[in-house]
Amino acid sequence: DLKNFLINIIENKYYRKDTFIKNNIYKFIEFYFLKLISLNKSQKQIHLLYENFIKKIFYLKKFNLDEEAFFIEFKTKILNG
């Protein structure tokens, strides 16, 4: 499933090694959020997290910020790893 796929990418740091994953990792993260929103009853809370992480992705790309910290936070807060 998508959750395990994202955990695998983050733990093995494939986003650094594979150009396809590097170019698409943020799309996979957005798909995961959309899946959570559609499946959960607490949509408002997840929607707020979604907006927060989308802003972080925007700033990460715009200012070339540290991806490692972003992925650790995403894994901890969203993937519960």
What are these regions (language model features)?
Residues 1-81:
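AAA+ P-loop NTPase domains with strong preference for DNA replication initiators
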